[in-house]
Structure formats: C-alpha cells, structure tokens
Design a protein with these regions (language model features):
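ABC ATPase nucleotide-binding domains
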Residues: 225, 229-258
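Helix-to-loop junction immediately C-terminal to a conserved catalytic motif
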Residues: 48
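Catalytic Walker B motif of ABC-type/P-loop ATPase nucleotide-binding domains
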Residues: 156-160
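ABC ATPase NBD coupling module
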Residues: 64-78
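The feature captures the beta-strand-to-loop junction immediately N-terminal to the Walker
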Residues: 33-35
Length: 258
C-alpha cells in the first residue's frame, strides 16, 4: 500500500534522509521509530504530499501523494499531527465530525468517541481539554475519516499520537489503530515508546540518526536491544512480564551523567 524506495532528502545542504526504503502494508500497524532528528516526521510529510524527496519515490497504492489533489488525498490519507491544530471554539463531537460532514451525530462517531473514552465529553469545547484528551479527539477524527473513505485505498499516518496520553488511554488508542488496520487500512505511526511499539504494532521500521533505515520487519523481531542500542546510543534491558510480553528499558550509563 505505502511503498518508500531509496528516499533521499536534505535541507539547506544537510542530508536528512539517505536511501530510506520500507513499506507499510494493509491490515498492519507499522511503527516508525528512531532518535530525534532521524527523519521520521519528514517521512510522514513526504507521505502526505507536503514534501517531495530529492531522489527516490514514495507511493500510496501506486500514486505519488504530491501529485494528488486535496480531495483525492483526503479520500485516501488521514493524518494525526504531533500537536492539535483545530479551532478551539468547537466541541469534541464537532471536531471529530469534521472528518465526515453530515455524519456528526452518526453511530460511527459515537462508537469511536466511546472507544477513546470521550463519549462523556463530546459536548465540551476542544480547547478546554487536556493535552491527552485533545490527542484522543484528534485521533478519533482521523479514524472516522478513514472509516468514511469511499475507496479501497485507506492510509492513516500518525505522528506521536499517544505522547500525551496516560498508559490506559495509550493502550486503548493503539488497540483502536490496530482495529482500524484490520478493517482494511495501512497504519504508519511514529512512536517513542518502544515497548508499546513492540507489543501493539505488527511491524517496525528503525531509522538511524543519519536518516538510514537500520532495520525493518516484524516488530517483535526488529525491536530488540541488539538493534536499538547502536541506533539510540544507550543500553537497553529487556524483561519479560508474567503475560510473556517483553519490556524494553533504556539504561543511561553512569559515566555519561555530568
């Protein structure tokens, strides 16, 4: 569905992406992880058609998103930004309903609001919500948009969509993204919580600081201390919980603390 091939991009002569190659498939949630400045958000902007690579291609169902009209993009791609940018004078239900005009009061919107624990806040002004609640409302809007898309090409891009959420709501949000993927969408999500990425994403792409894909594949196989330590420059301790899930904890060496 989403295929990136040999993506190169630089700003003011400084390379940001160097030959990034990966894919995000229908029915799967793909985590995009890496240190700050590795080019994760830049890749999402290319996928949105906002930026064009200097070299290489990124296509969605064979189409270059930069060459699509705004209505065509909206019918294929939903986006969750790092920070909410909607007008604060609207209610939660109105914000979510923007994704499907005329369906603001539909059962679809109500269902998504309930899944993200926003059903009791749907009448509140978006601007009165906490940062985590605003993230949930913004995510709800994108999911409603995906469900309303008319064609078979459905892609959801999310840039750190759970960074302000508490653990319970972050897990609920990731589970809903997984359900959205299972309904025929390709989901590509930037995450800094590596344990969440390993446990709740199907696949993972690891970007190094130099904008090179260091590893890509099933999340459980890719997100390991051996792969992550040289990328992030810290040691990771892996522990297995009673349920069998692996938890990754970064450990900063005492010799590096000033």
């Amino acid at each position: 569905m989403l295929d990136a091939r040999d993506i190169h991009l630089g700003f003011s002569g400084t390379p940001v992406l160097r030959g990034a190659t990966f894919a995000a498939r229908v029915g799967r949630v793909t985590a995009l992880v890496g240190p700050n400045g590795a080019g994760k958000s830049t890749l999402l902007r290319i996928a949105l058609g906002v930026l064009a690579p200097d070299r290489g291609t990124l296509t969605i169902a064979g189409a270059d998103p930069a060459k699509l009209s705004d209505p065509q993009r909206a019918a294929m791609i939903a986006f969750v930004p790092q920070r909410a940018s909607v007008a604060f004078g609207f209610t939660v239900r109105e914000v979510v309903g923007f994704a499907a005009p005329g369906r603001e009061k539909s059962a679809e919107v109500a269902s998504v609001l309930e899944c993200l624990s926003l059903d009791q806040r749907e009448g509140e002004l978006f601007g009165h919500l906490s940062a985590g609640q605003q993230q949930r409302a913004t995510l709800a809007r994108a999911i409603v948009q995906v469900r309303a898309m008319p064609g078979p090409t459905r892609v959801l891009l999310a840039d750190e969509p759970v960074s302000a959420m508490d653990p319970r709501h972050a897990i609920d949000a990731m589970a809903l993204l997984g359900h959205t993927a299972s309904q025929g969408a390709a989901v590509l999500v930037v995450l800094h919580d590596l344990t969440l990425a390993r446990r709740l994403c199907d696949d993972a792409v690891v970007l190094g600081r130099e904008g090179v894909v260091r590893a890509a594949g099933p999340a459980a196989e890719v997100l390991t201390p051996a792969t992550l330590e040289p990328v992030f420059g810290v040691r990771f301790e892996a522990a297995t919980t009673e349920s069998g899930a692996q938890v990754l904890t970064p450990v900063r060496g005492a010799d590096r603390i000033p």
